[in-house]
Structures are given as C-alpha cells and as structure tokens.
Curated annotation (Swiss-Prot):
Keyword Ligase: no
Domain of life: Bacteria
Function comment: Catalyzes the reversible formation of acyl-phosphate (acyl-PO(4)) from acyl-[acyl-carrier-protein] (acyl-ACP). This enzyme utilizes acyl-ACP as fatty acyl donor, but not acyl-CoA.
Reaction catalyzed: a fatty acyl-[ACP] + phosphate = an acyl phosphate + holo-[ACP]
Keyword Signal: no
NCBIfam families: plsX
Name used for this protein in its record: Phosphate acyltransferase
GO biological process, one term: phospholipid biosynthetic process
Pathway this chain belongs to: Lipid metabolism; phospholipid metabolism
InterPro entries per the UniProt record, alphabetical: FA_synthesis, Phospholipid_synth_PlsX-like
Family: Belongs to the PlsX family.
Amino acid sequence: MGSTCVRIAIDAMGGDHAPNEIVAGAVRASEELGVKVLLVGDPQQIASALPPKTNLERVEIVPAEEAIAMDEEPLNAVRRKRKASINVAMDLVKREQADAIFSAGHSGAAMASALLRLGRLPGVDRPAIGTVFPTIKAGKPVLILDVGANVDCRPKFLEQFAVIGSIYSQYVLGTGEPKVGLLNIGEEDTKGNELALRTHQLLKDNSNINFIGNAEGRDVLSGEFDVIVCDGFVGNILLKFAEAIGGVILQILREELPQGLHGQIGTAILKPNLKRIKQRMDHAEHGGALLLGVSGVCLIGHGSSQAPSVFNAIRMAKEAVDNQVMQQLQSQYEILHSTSD
C-alpha cells in the first residue's frame, strides 16, 4: 500500500458493547496506526461516543439506519435490512471506499453480507473463519480454520481451507513454508472419521501445501504446526475452549499463591510474568478472526469485544491490507481451482 492511508470500515453498532467500546478502539487505531476509520451506524450515538479532541481527518461517520441483533436469523436479516450497519460497511468495501471491514456483531450476518456483497474468491466453495492461536513457542502462532463458518464440511472444503490458510500464514504471518496439519483423533493416517480420512488423502496429494500429517488436540498449541484445518463445528468448540484457558490458569495461580506478606511479595515479583502470560493467551491480543475466501479483507470480532480487541482487530486488518493478502489469494486462484472433488 506504500504511504497510502489504509481505510477500515467499522460496524459501530455490532457487539455487546457497541457503540462506545467499538468507537474507542477505532479512534485509538486511527491515532496509533495511522489508519482512517469509517464508523458506520447511528450518527448521533457514534458522535456521543467519540472521545474529546478526536482527529476527524482520520475518523468519518457513515450513517446507517438499522442494526442486526444477535438473535436474528442472519441471512433473512441481511436481505431484509439493506441499510443495516453491517451491509452499509460491507458496501464501502465493495465500492472500494474502504480497504477492509471489522464487525463484532452477528458473525453469521457478517458472513452472509460478505458473501452477498463481495462474493467468493474464484475456486473457493466455502469461506472459512480463521483465527490465530498463541503457542508455547513465543512469536510462532498457529492459524486455525474453520472456527465457525461451516459446521458441516466436505473434504474438498477442508483442502481449500489448507491452501487459503497457507497463503495467509506465508504472506501475513511471515511463515517461510507453512506446516499444515489436519485436526484429528490420532497421528496415524488410518485414524479418524470418513471426513478426516478422505481429507487426509487430499492434503497428502496436494503438492501446493506443506502437509505434515494429523494434529491431535495436544498438538494445537505445540508450535509444531503453522496451519491446522478442521470443520467449523469442531473448530468453534476448540476456539471457545482455548479462549477460556488463559483466565483459568491465571485464576488457579491467584488461588495457589500463599496469603499474607509472603504471598504479597511473591505476587509483586511475579506480576510482570503474569502480565506477559495473560498477553500471550488473551484472545483480545489478536482482536478478531479473518473471514478467508471472500473477495475482501473481513475481520470478525468476538461479541464481547472491548476497545483493546477492536484496536488489535484493526491492526490485523491493516497488516492484511499492507501485505496485500487479497492480491496473494487472488493470484493463487489456479491452485484453488485445482483442488479435487
């Protein structure tokens, strides 16, 4: 992108803490990352949430008449509410008035809106939601996909996830030759259900990816894999479990530290370490999950996202734009077309 200012469309009305936390994180990103944020939603509510002395050269309010609630059926709501904030924000990307979009609202609505407005990349049957997990090797995250977009998958879909994930890992996460694994119940080629067995063979035969075999649950955070593929049903359970790990570990540590003066001294000594542990394991540090396979950079945030998560999601979106991830994915469409039925 060079020196061009990256423009991020923000669904300001999406999420449990919208618009205040969404706006706060977006404004911080405009100040610290040098991006321009387009806040889409109710102008009055957004204006009220803006911090004093906001630099309006990098913050723009884009009116939207409606919002999609978490309990609405996503496809029907997206089609019915054409002026909903997620649709207006997605249209900004479609018209190339924004380079990327972030929403912490209804993830199903975000996916439906992206498919209807942006469309799929050539050769992609099903987009996948990919999220970055920390591993025991500092600075070496693993990309997991799908974590919720497709609860039922065919082997061909998982093969495409592996190709898309490899491209993203290489060009955005900076992995030299991404090691791809298939989430399974054993490392042997003969383990797993029919989906796993058929997918394993497809991945093994695909010369466009560096498939190193099955990944068991214990391998997910080992740092041995750069990309792990699974269906969205299993992936979403894995995501929610992983999000809880950091809080559980910190809570156990707090309970096990001795009480009294010795405990206070120990806590003071360990405080910097505990903070670093929290940062490495906190999903807010990554901010959002990417909807990979649509014709645009789309970040989906947790419904409970607060300002730090929003900031980090926008950072991820900027990195994806700066690293030209869409151009890289589009240039690989022949590889995607070559995937087997």
